[in-house]
């Protein structure tokens, strides 16, 4: 996808905020964020802020999208197969699809999943498989995964997601209720090694499915 002036300006802002991966910055610059927003909010597409997309959900702040993606790219195992929990608008999905060979994405709200799938087709991104399902359970039949990224805050670490992570794999997940932390978890010799990245604010990771 070709970068726009607004996309370039957003990428520069994220660079100033500490994002250093040129691959991530290029993907952000070239992805039309307005395509993932309701008409009434399209004028805010290139602001570095989270925005509502309906169904009580949000499109994440571009900085946090870039930060989480950069953490995946920095994984020592050079991931190719990525699982995303919480498709939402599909914005994070589109960024991932430009940087990894295969992306699997699970969304519990059917309406959002349908809309996101349509956007992927419009953007000519075809290395993505989507599923309507319970994000807490992951997508075991397609695993294990080199990397897993979760775009909603879990009250505790979901065991099913840990079980679907390959040896040498990396899981990026916000954890907590009122106080949330972004965690980077690596599976090393069968053990999970956890690093806390920064404080964050996400919508909760809710169990179950919603039509």
From Swiss-Prot:
Reaction(s) catalysed (UniProt annotation): [protein]-L-isoaspartate + S-adenosyl-L-methionine = [protein]-L-isoaspartate alpha-methyl ester + S-adenosyl-L-homocysteine
Domain of life the protein comes from: Bacteria
GO biological process: methylation; protein modification process; protein repair
Keywords from the named record: Cytoplasm, Methyltransferase, S-adenosyl-L-methionine, Transferase
An annotated Gene Ontology molecular function: protein-L-isoaspartate (D-aspartate) O-methyltransferase activity
SUPFAM superfamilies tied to this protein: S-adenosyl-L-methionine-dependent methyltransferases (SSF53335)
Alphabetical list of InterPro entries matching this protein: PCMT, SAM-dependent_MTases_sf
Gene Ontology, cellular component aspect: cytoplasm
Chief subcellular location: cytoplasm
The enzyme's E.C. designation: 2.1.1.77
Disulfide bonds: none
Catalytic-site annotation from UniProt: 60
Protein localization: Cytoplasm
Stored HAMAP family: PIMT (MF_00090)
Record PANTHER family: PROTEIN-L-ISOASPARTATE O-METHYLTRANSFERASE, PROTEIN-L-ISOASPARTATE(D-ASPARTATE) O-METHYLTRANSFERASE
Its biological purpose: Catalyzes the methyl esterification of L-isoaspartyl residues in peptides and proteins that result from spontaneous decomposition of normal L-aspartyl and L-asparaginyl residues. It plays a role in the repair and/or degradation of damaged proteins.
Homology family: Belongs to the methyltransferase superfamily. L-isoaspartyl/D-aspartyl protein methyltransferase family.
Protein known as: Protein-L-isoaspartate O-methyltransferase
